[in-house]
Amino acid sequence: MTSNAELKKFRNISECLEYYIVDLDWTGASQLIIFQSSISSLEVGDEIGIFDDNAIINSGDCSSQIGESLLGSGIWTGSQIEIVSIGSIDNCAFGGFQLPGFVNGNSVTIKVYRPSTGIEYSSNATYSAGTGTFGDLFMAVSDLNLFDSSLAGCTDSSACNFNPDATFDVVMWRCGDVALWRLAD
């Protein structure tokens, strides 16, 4: 006879995550991102990771440490899924402390791990709702363009993002301290 605990184990697909395992405590701040069933680039079983490249990563103090952080994850089942990401809390102005998570106003980074190939892909998302910026009421992703970021770069040896192994070009430019890029046309 199967116990309720065993049944629950099979019903909760998030327990199948192997690559994107969120290691943050819940802060109470969150961001909903919907991945619509119209996405054709994903395979059933792909793991989706939501990142902030400039998240608050310290906890319990006001050291304002910034870095990449995995904030939410889910497994693509072939139909719409919703992933909730964990937001940071910063009460330092009131004599409090910070908790790790995304920072409102930062760009959402979506990565996909495909177990069938063992490759982690970067992505460019198309949003049917929201802007791709943390702090939106919610976001809906209608399409994802996946690429192996280890092969991204430029085939021009004089470029700042030259990669002799690159299989496609990425256009890169700077805006203050932020490096921006897009796939070349």
Pin down the residues of each PLM region.
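Primarily marks secretory-pathway-exposed extracellular/lumenal segments that are disulfide-
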Residues: 1-185
